[in-house]
Amino acid sequence: MAARRRRSTGGGRARALNESKRVNNGNTAPEDSSPAKKTRRCQRQESKKMPVAGGKANKDRTEDKQDGMPGRSWASKRVSESVKALLLKGKAPVDPECTAKVGKAHVYCEGNDVYDVMLNQTNLQFNNNKYYLIQLLEDDAQRNFSVWMRWGRVGKMGQHSLVACSGNLNKAKEIFQKKFLDKTKNNWEDREKFEKVPGKYDMLQMDYATNTQDEEETKKEESLKSPLKPESQLDLRVQELIKLICNVQAMEEMMMEMKYNTKKAPLGKLTVAQIKAGYQSLKKIEDCIRAGQHGRALMEACNEFYTRIPHDFGLRTPPLIRTQKELSEKIQLLEALGDIEIAIKLVKTELQSPEHPLDQHYRNLHCALRPLDHESYEFKVISQYLQSTHAPTHSDYTMTLLDLFEVEKDGEKEAFREDLHNRMLLWHGSRMSNWVGILSHGLRIAPPEAPITGYMFGKGIYFADMSSKSANYCFASRLKNTGLLLLSEVALGQCNELLEANPKAEGLLQGKHSTKGLGKMAPSSAHFVTLNGSTVPLGPASDTGILNPDGYTLNYNEYIVYNPNQVRMRYLLKVQFNFLQLW
């Protein structure tokens, strides 16, 4: 299991309570979704339409309609799946679909004001999941201005319009600001106090101080051309580890698997405030689920969440979030986004630095990682711990320990509660995209705005004494079969033992220091050993005789602490997952 100062049980992130009962949708009243009217103040230079399934594609009347159900006359077809690189000049890239201006213009900026905005709107009742992009562009060669607009269903190219304004900046601003007002009912100059208006678009808050992946690739290409490119001073095993956890492309692929739309809100660009707003929406969804409100209130809460955190469901209707499990999955998504925000900022390279980029990334972690020899005592004990606590119910894969790193996080040793007894070396697992955040910031507790019912024993740092329980939270696959597991020294002190999940477990401590969820199987104390002052609960697991007379019994133990100072990261394992053949 793993834990982060904010993550889930048994090793990954948020853990959902067991729930088998799904609830039906309630009926909701329709919203007025009449398309906005449009005026032109400048000459239209170019207005290209995407092919539509029947009927004439009139921009002024279809820009708010093409997002609906598949098969309607105004549903746009996707004509290309080609990936286009972003060319970044200034603080925001020109939309790659604006072929007339890519490489020839840049997004206009005035100080910290970037005339680039992505709007989003989701309405489950009408199967709306749409975006509206507006950019004010300035030509590179001369002071000619234009306004680029593109709109459609999330994940689709949609329709677009390019309005030329020659050298008249004021007219270009007027068009940009009016379109923003039309779509949001907010004034552009007051966007710092933006308020979502029902039936209108929301504004995605972007961080323009963060480099995009494409800018980083450009920097890497430039650095490779330098004849003075320094060699890395890191051990080769550490170099490979840093490459693994700082792989932005892999992060993007992982987020796409979770249905997050990386084109509308590129990784590293979504602000902390936007992610926090996503948590607040999930809290509303949690309130609806707990109150049994499965009609209009739940639908509006889901609309708000998908509007704030863009998802790509293709032409399918965005699903209602109706169960604790579905809520937990969205909490995991936001936690991953938060970690990726940290990672994107950390991997920004300094071209003029005397260090190799990998050395820069490693230094920015503020976390020492020392490879251990495979013949060392620590390696042998931990390898035995890994294999002997592989749970019998997790039989679809085996694990091979590739490398072991001793971890020394800046400040953790000094802050650690050594005064507490009952210190154990316990497991925590997490997605590959989360490790930069974990190693640079430590294991963290979920933020206050996160729903509490997404966590089995409340908002704490979760650990396991069974390796595979935590390994499941690595979400490895046959194609991506490398994962990382963390072993932390956890000062458990006196445990409050529970037979079943309770999201309010922290409030039940009554002077105790941690929560322990009791499982049916666990390592026997007869096999325990001590490593550097911590108890290592070696397996194999045996029947504990634990039975919950009132309901479901946990399969394996859960350990939860609610204070990061009770955790000290000690070892990081690089593991290969060997999945069994299906036939």
UniProtKB/Swiss-Prot annotation:
Q: What is this protein called?
A: Poly [ADP-ribose] polymerase 2
**What would changing residue 338 to A do, according to UniProt?**
Does not affect DNA-induced ADP-ribosyltransferase activity
Give every PARP alpha-helical domain span.
231-348
Domain PARP catalytic positions: 356-583
What's in the keyword line of the UniProt record?
Acetylation, ADP-ribosylation, Allosteric enzyme, Chromosome, DNA damage, DNA repair, DNA-binding, Glycosyltransferase, NAD, Nucleotidyltransferase, Nucleus, Phosphoprotein, Transferase
Domain (WGR): residue spans on this chain:
104-201
Taxonomically, the superkingdom here is: Eukaryota
N6-acetyllysine (modified residue): where?
37-38
Residue spans with biased composition (Basic and acidic residues)? Answer: 57-67
PTM summary from the entry reads: Auto poly-ADP-ribosylated on serine residues, leading to dissociation of the PARP2-HPF1 complex from chromatin. Poly-ADP-ribosylated by PARP1. Acetylation reduces DNA binding and enzymatic activity.
If you read the UniProt record, what top EC class would you report for this enzyme, in one word?
transferase
Tell me how this protein assembles. Component of a base excision repair (BER) complex, containing at least XRCC1, PARP1, POLB and LRIG3. Homo- and heterodimer with PARP1. Interacts (via the PARP catalytic domain) with HPF1. Interacts with core nucleosomes.
- Chain positions of site Cleavage: 207-208
Instruction: Give the residue ranges for region: N-terminal region (NTR).
Output: 1-103
Q: What does this protein do?
A: Poly-ADP-ribosyltransferase that mediates poly-ADP-ribosylation of proteins and plays a key role in DNA repair. Mediates glutamate, aspartate or serine ADP-ribosylation of proteins: the ADP-D-ribosyl group of NAD(+) is transferred to the acceptor carboxyl group of target residues and further ADP-ribosyl groups are transferred to the 2'-position of the terminal adenosine moiety, building up a polymer with an average chain length of 20-30 units. Serine ADP-ribosylation of proteins constitutes the primary form of ADP-ribosylation of proteins in response to DNA damage.
Domain note:
The N-terminal region (NTR) recognizes and binds poly-ADP-ribose chains produced by PARP1, leading to its recruitment to DNA damage sites.
Active site as annotated: 558
Gene coding for it: PARP2
Q: From which lineage does this chain's organism come?
A: Eukaryota, Metazoa, Chordata, Craniata, Vertebrata
